[in-house]
A protein has these predicted regions:
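Terminal targeting signals and extreme-terminal segments of soluble enzymes
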Residues: 1-81
Length: 81
């Protein structure tokens, strides 16, 4: 595991939301991060589809970590805008 991947994985594991939705960090490369989440009842809306808030939160998380992967060590990203 690279230092970059270790830094991002450590941050990922500290996020309670990601544990709650059962998200996993699949891959980390400079400028690209892949996150998977199983579809389950806990992330559904009233029609049985995955709630859009969960989708946008996972997208924001992946984009934030992809940006963080390009920054110097010790730099953090709060959100992707």
């Amino acid at each position: 595991m690279t230092d970059l991947e270790s830094r991002i994985r450590d941050s990922f594991e500290k996020q309670g939301f990601l544990r709650t939705v059962r998200a996993t960090l699949v891959s980390v490369e400079a400028g690209a991060v892949e996150i998977h989440m199983p579809i389950h009842e806990g992330v559904s809306q009233q029609h049985g589809f995955v709630h859009a808030g969960v989708v946008s939160a996972l997208g924001d998380t992946a984009a934030g970590y992809a940006a963080m992967s390009l920054l110097p060590d010790g730099a953090e990203v709060l959100t992707a805008e």
